[in-house]
């Protein structure tokens, strides 16, 4: 897909009744109702196939403000759904080193557990840093 191709139309806005219309390659204009959590305005740089239409919630980032580097984002999460694909369930999208992963409830709970475990480890390491900087345990 070429980045210099124009957007098909200005990002369609949601109508008062919660619907929006998307021009697709294979099904013409598709009129759909967006879930209340859908943040995407459904503007595409090229017409998508109907199965590529995506609902996404507003992304939420874990943010940290460090004295050394200032504010930084750590992980992005948000709801995602392809209402016309064979995977029409709602997923949690998580930005990782492996890319943007879509997981169900079990995967989401496991990621949350891993992040809590990592947060505990970071707290332990921060305590160790305090001791090292104070000259203890060197």
Language model: regions and residue ranges:
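Positively charged, low-complexity terminal tracts
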Residues: 1-138
